[in-house]
Each structure stands twice: as structure tokens, then as C-alpha cells.
């Protein structure tokens, strides 16, 4: 999310994420003749060990901020997308946001 929704004070972090996004298509094209594909998944707000250290009210507010579905992402959500990427060979050189349509505020 920070590659496209950069936040105040996080310019270097956003730039690093933007670098990954910028490499996605060239990294798909270069080895394509060998049948190698490249995709980037840009996850939104997921339930992670770091997030679970936050107070419950913060976790609830983050989950509620996701337009649909209004919840935190799960490992199963991520795994379903990975499975689709693996099984659909037409997916190549793309960045897929897995974020429930959330966009971060500047702060």
C-alpha cells in the first residue's frame, strides 16, 4: 500500500515499496521465454504478530477502516490469491492489491 499511498514521514519506506512495484514487469519480461512468471502481491492490513501486539481497540478500528470486507486480512486470504496466481498462467507482470479497497490517509 505504501508504494502508492505514501504516508508522511515514510518517504524511504514508500520508495522501497515503489522499487518492488517498478521491478515487477521487467522481472516478468526478462525470463518469460523460459516460462518464468513474476507477480507482486501488495497486501493491505493483515492480522500479523506485530499487529496483534496493538491494543484491541486499535485492531478493531483498523479492521473497520477496510471498505469490504471490513476485517483484517488473513493468511487464508493471501494463500487463495497465491493459488490463483500459480494456477492461472496468464497472470504475469502485475501488482495485485489485496486490501479490501482501503487507501491510507497521509498521516
Per-region residue spans from a language model:
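Catalytic loop of short-chain dehydrogenase/reductase
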Residues: 1-19, 24-33, 45
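Active-site pre-Tyr helix/loop in NAD(P)-dependent dehydrogenases
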Residues: 1-4, 68, 101
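Conserved catalytic-core motifs of eukaryotic protein kinase domains, centered on the activation segment
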Residues: 7-8, 51-53
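Short coil/turn segments at alpha/beta junctions that flank glycine-rich nucleotide-binding fingerprints
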Residues: 8-9, 33-35, 65, 89
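Conserved Rossmann-fold SDR core element
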Residues: 21, 31-47, 91-98
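Conserved sequence/active-site signature of Rossmann-fold short-chain dehydrogenase/reductase
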Residues: 45-47, 51, 103
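Catalytic Tyr-x(3-8)-Lys segment
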Residues: 57-77
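C-terminal substrate-recognition "lid" of short-chain dehydrogenase/reductases
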Residues: 74-98, 103
Amino acid at each position: 500500500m505504501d508504494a502508492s499511498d505514501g504516508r508522511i514521514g515514510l518517504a524511504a519506506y514508500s520508495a522501497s515499496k515503489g522499487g518492488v512495484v517498478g521491478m515487477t514487469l521487467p522481472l516478468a519480461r526478462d525470463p518469460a521465454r523460459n516460462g518464468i512468471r513474476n507477480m507482486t502481491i501488495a497486501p493491505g492490513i493483515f492480522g500479523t504478530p506485530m499487529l496483534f501486539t496493538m491494543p484491541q481497540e486499535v485492531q478493531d478500528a483498523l479492521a473497520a477502516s477496510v471498505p469490504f470486507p471490513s476485517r483484517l486480512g488473513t493468511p487464508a486470504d493471501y494463500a487463495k490469491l497465491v493459488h490463483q496466481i500459480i494456477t492461472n498462467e496468464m497472470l504475469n507482470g502485475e501488482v495485485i492489491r489485496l486490501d479490501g479497497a482501503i487507501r491510507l490517509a497521509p498521516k
